[in-house]
Amino acid sequence: SACVYEKLENGKLQGVATEGLFPPQRKMRTALSEETASRARFLEKILSSEILEEGEGIVGEVAKTGKPVFVPNAQNDPRVVKHPDPALAIRSMVYSPLIHDDVVLGVLVVANPSSGLTFSDMDLSLVNSLAEQAALAIKNSDAMNLRVEKTRMDSDLSLAREVQGL
């Protein structure tokens, strides 16, 4: 499972994209139960409403320092939140900053390899490479959105000039 945390304008971090049953980075107030209509949707809702401070937990630490963190044995790491639900048990995690032009845009977090084992140094390298690509994609998306907005404003101004000229 994985989650992308985006760094907001106020410097805080918010989960914006999840894959699988990604465990929240804080203790949950609401119990996750079998009755929950969609566990993945429920967790996605929790993660998107969970705002982390820069420096808070491992996600916040990575956002603050811009350095990746590798947790090969999460069950023995006191920094990792422990959830009572076995579906949210964390075995191993990789936290990688999304950096572009020396600016941290967010954090990519990957939990629990599908092998059931722990992540390796090679996995850490792969996640760091994915984070670099994701940061570039985010910046390209931002640039495209700015271009679209500029085109829209230019069109509105052109229309306003035509209306004024009538």
Question: What are the roles of these predicted feature ranges?
Answer:
Residues R91-I99:
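A short, aliphatic-rich beta-strand micro-motif
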Residues C3-E50, N76:
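GAF sensory/regulatory domain recognition
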Residues A135-L166:
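Regulatory cytosolic signal-relay segments
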Residues V81-K82, H100, L105, A111-L130:
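Regulatory loop-to-helix N-cap segments in sensory/regulatory domains
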Residues E61-P68, D101, L126-R147:
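Signal-transmission/dimerization alpha-helices at domain junctions
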Residues Q14, L43-K45, E50, G55-G60, ...:
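Signal-transducing coupling segments at domain and membrane junctions
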Residues V59, Y95, V107:
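Short hydrophobic/aromatic beta-strand element in the GNAT-like acyltransferase core
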Residues S1, K7, E61, T65, ...:
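Amphipathic alpha-helical regulatory segments at dimerization interfaces
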